Regions:
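Hydrophobic membrane-insertion alpha-helices, especially the h-region
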Residues: 1-10
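PDZ/PDZ-like peptide-tail recognition elements
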Residues: 15-35, 41-51, 70-123, 181, ...
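Short, solvent-exposed loop/turn elements at domain surfaces
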Residues: 53-57
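Helix-boundary/low-complexity linker signature
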Residues: 64-66
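Terminal peptide-recognition signature
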Residues: 103, 128, 135-138, 169, ...
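PDZ-domain C-terminal substructure recognizer with occasional recognition of PDZ-binding tails
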Residues: 106, 153-200
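Hydrophobic beta-strand core residues of beta-sandwich domains
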Residues: 122, 132, 146, 159-161
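Conserved PDZ fold ligand-binding element
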Residues: 128-151
Length: 245
């Protein structure tokens, strides 16, 4: 029993340690792209996990291991699911930015689509609690397509100031659209501020010609944006920008 506690009981502390290096070309494929380059770009990772009592002690004395407090990793009221969703969104954004920069530099065709706002976190006891879920995309507000994060926030403020607290939203959840009415209310611990009670970010997608596929598996976080960009560029142009390294 004691051994199980020492090995498995999660503490409110994280251990960060070195991960692995990956050849980015194994995860990025440009349609009809240049493939005869001699060098490669590498994606470096770190591993972040909750510490058990035994791992906590081990990390204290192990080179290149670092103990990190919970509030350095998690946002306020963020649970495990919300944390994982935020990390996945950061990786999606990293890939979007890499495609945008690479195609902008090469003057090849691309199109950016604003999909709506992406729900990262639901504040417990807030207006959206029990209605919205982390990972939802809000695509319309009161019949209007959401074309920017600023537009969405401004519409919420305008409706609140006009005394309209019942707000109709169209939600995309797992590629299924549905409508919900959320009633604005005071956000807990906000000193009287009224709103939806969600943390959100922009949801954008990009289509390119030629098509690019990025499949990084379970790696999350804001990693590898520069390496993705360089690898995409390297496959788009004839030049070997790795210079053989």
């Amino acid at each position: 029993m004691l051994a199980g506690v020492l090995l498995l009981y999660p503490l409110d502390v994280y251990v960060m340690r070195p991960g692995n290096a990956y050849n980015v070309s194994e995860y990025v494929t440009v349609q009809d792209g240049d493939e005869d380059d001699e060098g490669s770009f590498s994606l470096m990772t770190v591993t972040l996990s909750k510490a058990s009592p035994l791992m906590y002690v081990y990390a204290k004395f192990k080179d290149y291991y670092e103990l990190i407090s919970m509030n350095q990793v998690r946002q306020d009221e963020e649970d495990d699911n919300e944390y994982n969703i935020r990390q996945a969104k950061l990786m999606t954004d990293s890939q979007f930015n890499a495609l945008y920069v690479a195609f902008s530099r090469t003057d090849l065709e691309y199109k950016v689509t604003f999909n709506g706002v992406y729900v990262l976190n639901i504040i417990t006891g807030g207006a959206a609690d029990g209605i919205l879920e982390p990972g939802d995309e809000i695509v319309e507000i009161e019949g209007e397509h959401i074309d920017s994060q600023a537009m969405f926030a401004q519409r919420i403020v305008e409706m609140r100031d006009q005394g309209q607290y019942d707000i109709e939203l169209v939600i995309n959840r797992d590629d299924e659209l549905f409508t919900e009415v959320v009633t604005l209310k005071e956000i807990p611990n906000s000193k009287g501020k009224v709103g939806l009670g969600v943390v959100f970010s922009e949801s954008k997608s990009i289509t390119t010609d030629p098509h690019v596929n990025i499949d990084i598996g379970s790696i999350g976080g804001p990693s590898a944006g520069l390496m993705f960009t360089l690898e995409i560029l390297n496959q788009l142009v004839d030049e070997d920008i790795t210079k053989g390294y």
